[in-house]
């Protein structure tokens, strides 16, 4: 956890516009810090559209933010199922236009899945902020 915040805070001057991040690896943390209903977690599992929607809404509310991103996924090597294989990642973005979500299935090892997730999260967040579809490629 924390890859998006790490990437953002590597940018000089990010303290002018980046307030905070929430690393809610455990379901209990999602519930306690982001107000994700326990029933939602039980019904859908952490890696689901419903849960990332609740996560991003909770993050935006708790931070008083205009923009937020939430990620929940299975980076591997274990933890995957037939319905949610390793590499499954759900994203949600909060903006003045509302909440949007995407599901991606990434290939590669744990590090590759996490890096791809950070890239998508930041690129789409920049798109929401700037309204521009073209962003500079991000690399570690």
What feature does the model see in each segment?
Residues 1-140:
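Short alpha-helical segments enriched in small residues
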């Amino acid at each position: 956890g924390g890859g998006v915040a790490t990437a953002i805070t590597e940018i000089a001057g990010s303290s002018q516009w980046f307030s905070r991040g929430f690393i809610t690896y455990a379901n209990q943390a999602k519930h306690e810090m982001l107000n994700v209903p326990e029933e939602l977690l039980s019904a859908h599992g952490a890696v689901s559209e419903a849960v990332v929607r609740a996560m991003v809404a909770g993050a935006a509310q708790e931070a008083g933010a205009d923009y937020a991103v939430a990620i929940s996924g299975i980076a591997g090597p274990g933890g995957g199922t037939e319905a949610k294989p390793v590499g499954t990642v759900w994203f949600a973005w909060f903006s003045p236009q509302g909440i949007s979500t995407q599901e991606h299935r990434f290939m590669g090892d744990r590090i590759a899945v996490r890096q791809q997730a950070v890239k998508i999260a930041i690129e789409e967040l920049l798109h929401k902020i700037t309204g521009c579809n073209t962003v500079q490629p991000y690399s570690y």
